[in-house]
Amino acid sequence: MSDMITAAILGLVEGLTEFLPVSSTGHLIITGELLGFTGPKATTFEVAIQLGAILAVVVLYWDRFWGLLRPQPYVRFAGLRGIMLLLLTSLPASVLGLAAHSTIKAHLFTPSTVAIALAVGAIFMLLVERRTERPRYMTLDEMSPALALGIGCFQCLALWPGFSRSAATIMGGMLLGARRGLAAEYSFIAAVPIMFAATGYDLLKSWTLFTPADLPFFATGFVVSFLSAWAAVKLFIALVGRMTFRPFAWYRLAIAPLVYYFMAY
């Protein structure tokens, strides 16, 4: 299989799974093993193509991000208040991630821990879906500092590879009283600063693995990741108000043994 096809397949998997509550890590592990693309360079490539997925969310929510740079009298999720909410959400996982980065890389990327994270995240989703309380927060402009910080605390669960940042923040938001659609939308927006920081940090640490000859390979993965993430987020937001997350949970339980197998053997 050519390098460009490998890059395109991995970019497609990254884009489709990064913002869905299914764990992009688990899917990239399986896909990388099937394609025979593993090792330090593969890990760096997976980090790089995340930037394509991040850019897709920036494009989709450009008005919201632009609104953070200028106060708007009738929009509360804007200006300094909007920035403060995103900072509150990013803070817990940023602090914990920086403090425990080496430990996470060394001890939480084992076959058993990633597979268990997939299963635990699935059970968490099923439990949250059993709740029947009416949501208290309906739109981004109703977001409170307490809700933003609470979602940020749940985001720390995503430091466990395989748990899924989207699952942690969407389910955490719903548990704290956010409407299903709001929890998903805020999860995508709040992903940008922390994912950009984490991706940039990882790339800075591994930039020596890049060579000029790798540029077409990385560019292909980046572009495919951007396009597939754009489509996945658009479709997910269109459907999220009419569906539960139970199918995603059962799917995670089904692939957890596969992730363990491909990582262990």
UniProtKB/Swiss-Prot annotation:
<feature type="transmembrane region" description="Helical">
    <location>
        <begin position="143"/>
        <end position="163"/>
    </location>
</feature>
<keyword id="KW-0378">Hydrolase</keyword>
<dbReference type="GO" id="GO:0009252">
    <property type="term" value="P:peptidoglycan biosynthetic process"/>
</dbReference>
<dbReference type="GO" id="GO:0008360">
    <property type="term" value="P:regulation of cell shape"/>
</dbReference>
<keyword id="KW-0133">Cell shape</keyword>
<dbReference type="Pfam" id="PF02673">
    <property type="entry name" value="BacA"/>
</dbReference>
<feature type="transmembrane region" description="Helical">
    <location>
        <begin position="42"/>
        <end position="62"/>
    </location>
</feature>
<comment type="similarity">
    <text>Belongs to the UppP family.</text>
</comment>
<feature type="transmembrane region" description="Helical">
    <location>
        <begin position="82"/>
        <end position="102"/>
    </location>
</feature>
<feature type="transmembrane region" description="Helical">
    <location>
        <begin position="181"/>
        <end position="201"/>
    </location>
</feature>
<keyword id="KW-0812">Transmembrane</keyword>
<keyword id="KW-0046">Antibiotic resistance</keyword>
<comment type="function">
    <text>Catalyzes the dephosphorylation of undecaprenyl diphosphate (UPP). Confers resistance to bacitracin.</text>
</comment>
<feature type="transmembrane region" description="Helical">
    <location>
        <begin position="248"/>
        <end position="264"/>
    </location>
</feature>
<dbReference type="GO" id="GO:0071555">
    <property type="term" value="P:cell wall organization"/>
</dbReference>
<dbReference type="GO" id="GO:0050380">
    <property type="term" value="F:undecaprenyl-diphosphatase activity"/>
</dbReference>
<keyword id="KW-0997">Cell inner membrane</keyword>
<keyword id="KW-0573">Peptidoglycan synthesis</keyword>
<dbReference type="InterPro" id="IPR003824">
    <property type="entry name" value="UppP"/>
</dbReference>
<protein>
    <recommendedName>
        <fullName>Undecaprenyl-diphosphatase</fullName>
        <ecNumber>3.6.1.27</ecNumber>
    </recommendedName>
</protein>
<dbReference type="GO" id="GO:0005886">
    <property type="term" value="C:plasma membrane"/>
</dbReference>
<keyword id="KW-1133">Transmembrane helix</keyword>
<keyword id="KW-0961">Cell wall biogenesis/degradation</keyword>
<feature type="transmembrane region" description="Helical">
    <location>
        <begin position="221"/>
        <end position="241"/>
    </location>
</feature>
<dbReference type="GO" id="GO:0046677">
    <property type="term" value="P:response to antibiotic"/>
</dbReference>
<keyword id="KW-1003">Cell membrane</keyword>
<keyword id="KW-0472">Membrane</keyword>
<feature type="transmembrane region" description="Helical">
    <location>
        <begin position="108"/>
        <end position="128"/>
    </location>
</feature>
